Amino acid sequence: MKPKYTTKKQISAFCQSLGNDIFEDYPFDENWMAMRHMDKGGHVMAFCYEYYIGEVWVNVKCETDYREYWLKKYPEKIKPAYHMNKRHWLTMILDGSIANEDVETLLKTSYVLTKKGI
């Protein structure tokens, strides 16, 4: 069984597995990792950062039609995105509570939406 997503390293590895156009960037400081598209002018597909010591948060773009679904499914662990457009972005709090499949679905969706430039 695959370990739960709880680290920036795990998120980076998964994001980079989605396509060879994804790279890590640290636009603010070493805490804020941006996963960016090379071929889309550096558009961000996800921000990953420690918000509290030992607590990794990940901002992802989501389809607006599914926003409420995710907020209701994980009301304590998925929130309107920190420092982002709350209509289009969600924050996942990665403490092992969110199923791996759901973390991967949200990251894949963000990859597709940001690759298209939506």
Where are these regions (language model features)?
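Charge-dense, helix-prone N-terminal extensions
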Residues: 1-118
